[in-house]
Amino acid sequence: MKFLLPTFIIFIYTLLVSALPTKEGSDPKAAKKYLVSDLPGLHDNITPDDSIPLMFAGQLEIYPESNTHYFFWKFSDSNQETITNRTIFWLNGGPGCSSMDGALLETGPFRINSQQQVISNNGSWHKSGDIIYVDQPAGTGFSYSDTYITDLDQVANYFLKFMEAYYELFPQEINNEIYFAGESYAGQYIPYIANAILQRNKKLHEGEQKYDLRGVLIGNGWVSPNEQSLSYLPFFKDHGLIDIHHPKWATLLAKHEQCQKIVNKIDSTFDDGTVHYYEVSSSTCEAILTDLLEYTQDTANDKNQQCINMYDYTLRDSYPSCGMNWPNELVNVGPFLRQEKVMHQLNLINLKKWNECNGKVGRTFQARHSIPSVHLLPELAKEIPVMLFNGANDIICNSQGVLSYLQKLQWNGETGFINKDNQISWVYDNKEVGYMLWERNISFINIYNSSHMVPYDLPDVSRALIDLITGEYDEKDVDGKKSFVTYPLGSRKENDESKNPVESPSQTIDPIISSSSSSVESSLSSSSASATDSDSTSSKFTRLIQLAVILVIFWGVYVLYASYKSRPSSIIKKPTNNTSNITRSSTGKKKNVQWADQLNQFEDDERNQESNQGIIAKAIGKITGSKDTRGRYAPVHRENDNEYIDDIELGEGISDPNVDEFIIGSDDDDEEEQPRSDPATHKSVS
């Protein structure tokens, strides 16, 4: 009888795990080794109201022949009432910058405090769908490989291989709606990956299933590089950062005109389908921002306030950092991820030291044989909604540049936004937070009071972007303006009168979309109906399971009570140490067990199998500069030793002109230099 209660509890635990509605068909044995059940501060700083998410993480093998492993970290909401059949893949840019920036500074459930512990981010996107952060290309963050890739087509192919491996691990999710989201240089990655998925869906092989791609969200994206750079001088002038009387105005204007000639040449050959060197090389145009930051520095101010922050023009930084010391919490992320216990908790096979950006990946990834992703947007917009959102304070990927290339772009039968002046106000939580243009499946959203990293500044607002792209908003007249109204999580009114009058897929994806897209709309409607039916069936089944569990619990309690009551008093002995311990152990268990808590025991099964490898203790990466600044890191000056350190993503144009090449002094330099090809000659170089 002494083993009955523990056995009964394990039985109940098994039933509860099997009752999770959207986890049907999962293989716990396969996924078990990727479970994340603990992190520094997880159980101390995350309150029951916040709820601990269900987490899986690890390095998935995608190409054994090159030892290529992609690191992923997945977050799911542990609150069963808010579970959705939606998967969001998040990518950061660089190239070569880790998506852990997104996970721990932007859209994930946690931020990192100064004690290198997790604390709650109340604007996490995992409340709107399972979100998976992936370090890619290979070599980025915790991902690793014996070889590095060089072009955007490879990015797409590698990610498709990752998705195959991911869905082998989580086969129950293969029918989920899929969205891709990211920022900065991910504006190149995401369109290429999305296009590859759509092409794959059209030529499936036997046994393959369609990936239900529903849309892409690109924040402050580096989509049309030279067109974006052409916006720098107008942006500075329009925001009062420089004027025509500045002594360097003529010099800046001359460089702006040089860039304009390059853009004109690109426009003249835009549709010929050829990769032109003058389009994939953007160093001439990017030099404008380098000069602007130099010429506008305020030497009379404090040393750390002399340069305009290129990621948020309302902030200041030291020169030549100019924003690369931002955001402030970035200094907590690296030490957190470099803790050996955290590496083990994230199930790393290779205990690789984490760096925010990998210079070797950036140097190798030239993208000289790939047309910029702006060319792919029209084809994507034929099948899925494309959302381009921008923080209004960003310089490096500013809104003016995005609108400039969109107004030239032809998609779905028209050029640019036809009604550019017909702006739609975006209202969130009774506040106007931005405006949007939305036509023919492409939307542009300008978000007030936010930077290059919108989710960092406005986490709650950024999460509502998911509501916009999925149609979970109300269309209203607010203060005399047409407005799309979104709400804090869970507070949207659910009556028919308040629901969005444009609920059909054709209007949800695009209020002004033409009838020529009816086939796409019909397909989306069918998929939505199917998903709804599936959810309903799953919900009913889950309720039956839960009812059965409750009945079993009552039965178990009754059996235990009856068995003790029926014992003769002569055989009831004083509890021994062992029985006392059992009693305390069982009665000390939590009665209201959360999903993530239930799975804590899995960590114990693996603890004895973990490696004893230590952290690779090397110096932080240093940079000595580059001439070709396209998509590369900007060197950041160290005031004490006149050295340069890694930039966060897309600081490519801010470099010392006297510096010839990047030399990364990080843990990567202790490894053998990766083989790569010279994009211009295709010859192997070391």
UniProtKB/Swiss-Prot annotation:
Active site feature: S184, D394, H452
Cleaved signal peptide residues: 1-19
Which keywords does this Swiss-Prot/TrEMBL entry list?
Apoptosis, Carboxypeptidase, Glycoprotein, Golgi apparatus, Hydrolase, Membrane, Protease, Signal, Transmembrane, Transmembrane helix
Q: Which reaction does it catalyse?
A: Preferential release of a C-terminal arginine or lysine residue
Q: What class of enzyme is it?
A: hydrolase
Task: Report the locations given in the UniProt record.
Answer: Golgi apparatus, trans-Golgi network membrane
Pfam families cross-referenced by the UniProt entry? Peptidase_S10 (PF00450)
InterPro entries per record: AB_hydrolase_fold, Peptidase_S10, Ser_caboxypep_his_AS
Family designation? Belongs to the peptidase S10 family.
Protein's recorded name = Pheromone-processing carboxypeptidase KEX1
What organism does the UniProt record list as the source?
A: Candida dubliniensis (strain CD36 / ATCC MYA-646 / CBS 7987 / NCPF 3949 / NRRL Y-17841) (Yeast)
